[in-house]
Swiss-Prot record:
Role this protein plays: Required for the formation of a threonylcarbamoyl group on adenosine at position 37 (t(6)A37) in tRNAs that read codons beginning with adenine. Catalyzes the conversion of L-threonine, HCO(3)(-)/CO(2) and ATP to give threonylcarbamoyl-AMP (TC-AMP) as the acyladenylate intermediate, with the release of diphosphate.
Compartments reported by the entry: Cytoplasm
GO molecular function: ATP binding; double-stranded RNA binding; L-threonylcarbamoyladenylate synthase; tRNA binding
Main EC class the enzyme belongs to: transferase
Name the record gives this protein: Threonylcarbamoyl-AMP synthase
């Protein structure tokens, strides 16, 4: 478990609109404040990822995601599948709330969300009081970095803080499913 100074340093960077690198269930992720357009644009520039692709939000609990999700549109018969799958490395693509910014959804009217079971990410989201943008720590189309040293070599001074904690132990990135019909996009 991360010590408080590590979490505090990461939270300070997030609050200042910086991008952090942190461990997730399977890979290192790049993250920032989802409500800060400049921070999200900075993250996309670092990753060389087009905004049209949309991003994932990772949270400590579903309540943190409600601002971004049109919860009323999620079919009643899919809710048990969704909520029983969390916390875990399962990302669900849900209808986006009307006010969810396009810098998060890209070209879509949906938002990809996950409630994590990774202790460091849970603490980050708890202390920050909201979800984080979560995208794999790599340049778009390249392999994900496998260590903090590799991340520092690839991203140099572009990252505000490197949360040097262990990965969660999963060997594959999160499964991504459609909350409306259960279809697997990535499994």
């Amino acid at each position: 478990m991360s010590d408080q100074s590590t979490i505090a340093a990461a939270i300070t960077c997030l609050a200042q609109g910086e991008v952090i690198l942190y461990p997730t269930e399977a890979v290192y992720g790049l993250g920032c404040d989802p409500d800060n357009q400049q921070a999200v644009e900075r993250l996309l520039a670092i990753k060389q990822r087009p905004v049209e692709k949309g991003l994932i939000l990772i949270a400590d609990n579903y309540g943190q995601l409600l601002k971004y999700v049109d919860d009323a549109k999620i079919p009643m018969d899919k809710r048990a599948d969704i909520f029983s799958s969390w916390p875990n490395a399962i990302t669900w693509v849900m209808p986006a709330a009307k006010n969810t910014p396009k810098w998060l959804t890209g070209q879509y009217d949906t938002i990809a969300v996950r409630v994590t079971n990774h202790p460091t990410v849970k603490r980050l989201c708890q202390e920050f009081g909201k979800p984080l943008v979560s995208t794999s720590a790599n340049l778009s189309g390249q392999n994900t970095v496998l260590s903090i040293a590799e991340a520092k070599s690839q991203f140099t001074e572009q990252i505000g803080y490197y949360v040097d904690e262990p990965l969660g132990g999963n060997t594959q990135p999160s499964t991504i499913k459609d909350a409306m019909n259960g279809k697997v996009f990535r499994g």
